[in-house]
Amino acid sequence: MTPQLLGFFDSGLGGLTVLRRVLERHGSVPCVYLGDTARVPYGNRQPDDIRRIAAEVVGWLRDQKVSTVVMACNTTNALARDVADGQAGAPVIGLIGAAAAMVETRRVGVLATPATVASSAYRASIEALHPGSMVIEQACPAFVPLIESGDMNSDDLRRAAQAYLEPLLAASVESIVLGCTHYPLLVPLLRQLLPESVQIIDPAIGVARQLDAVLRSPGPISAVPRPFSLESCRFCVTADPDGFAMRATPWLGQRPDVSLQLLPD
């Protein structure tokens, strides 16, 4: 096992929001990122399929001898956390518990994929930590395909956001959890559509904090995002590496080198 080699995985671009939060907090740490772009999105798949995919992806990260697996994908975290724990051969850090720990209000909305919503994983985690909370989960099937297309200013994306937020606003939620790692890219749009008083919770921030003890960064950890380089990061995808690199550039602020990695189908 390589010391402090973090392994991240997601169905595509979304997990880069988690990676970026970690790098901004801890600097340029060695990591491997696997985007399963051949099978994106995960959130519209059946639970058994998601669990099978999680076993394959986490098994591949284990073979890379990572020291910690970061489930940078809410759908697999919701439906296959036990699979990841069994396959990783290393500690596993997920998003859902991190998000629940960040909740500070009683009326909570969750935007997530259909599979994550169907699992009720966010509701269970938030209610366990905050008894008496009202949790409303909203499935957002159109978000990931629209985000992966790369057009963050499309009318279709705005219309989808308005439709998905409507039941949460009707319930007067005080905070909204971004229950998919693609969704932080929607924060500028969501802020336009939400009252200023509604807090937006990005679970990736909680994951970056959980890694404090793992990485043991020297000196105090600044709350201000620090500059980082991608030189110590290896990026792999299961389809279209050039397209992924192009679409990932605005997410990371720099273009990653991306290689093709085939997995069992």
Curated annotation (Swiss-Prot):
One of the record's GO molecular function terms: glutamate racemase activity
Binding-site list for substrate: 10-11, 42-43, 74-75, 181-182
Disulfide bonds, paired cysteine numbers: none
Keyword Cell wall biogenesis/degradation recorded: yes
Active site: 73, 180
Catalytic activity: L-glutamate = D-glutamate
Listed pathway(s): Cell wall biogenesis; peptidoglycan biosynthesis
Documented EC number(s): 5.1.1.3
Keyword Isomerase found: yes
Major enzyme class: isomerase
Family: Belongs to the aspartate/glutamate racemases family.
Cross-referenced HAMAP family: Glu_racemase (MF_00258)
Protein name per Swiss-Prot or TrEMBL: Glutamate racemase
Gene that encodes the chain: murI
